[in-house]
Amino acid sequence: MFKVLSNVVLAPNLHRMMLRAPRIAAARKPGQFVIVRSAEGEERIPLTIGDADPRGGTVTLFIQAIGDSTRKIVEVAEGGYLRDVAGPLGMPTEIEPWGRVACIGGGVGTAVLFPMAKALADAGNEVTTIIGGRSKPYIILADELGEFSHEVRITTEDGSMGRKGFVTAELEEMIADADRRPAAVFAV
């Protein structure tokens, strides 16, 4: 059983859930995931590990509640328990000191991008993060990404936050400018 320490709604149908999972927190690397089951007999769901605190023994998951199984997971309130959390699983993202990098994500993809961007910054890279969404309520983790990104650029399809349009326009401008051109681009 894994205790839910917090469960916060970030955007429509998107939750940030922090769990007590010391073994997973100590072993996880960026790009890995866990398999979560809310209760006995429920479906097993793969979820990206958004963040981990090895000292505190916690992992953070970002969960888009779009089906019955993910809805049952996010219905577990703070203080409640998830039946199973298996992991970390999967091949971690290889992190190198590239220099200047661009990290790009949209909507719930921003949550998947978060651990990769953080690890790239921790490795000494100058990270420009470009995030997008349909509208302002779908822009997530901008402040958190700003804590370690050199720059955070935001786009929304309707122009309600940041630049109107798509993340690709921001990337095209960055690539066209020799002074801002990234050595590597990571997109989810």
Say what each PLM segment does.
Residues 1-78:
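Ferredoxin-reductase
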Residues 68-188:
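FNR/FR-type flavoprotein reductase catalytic core
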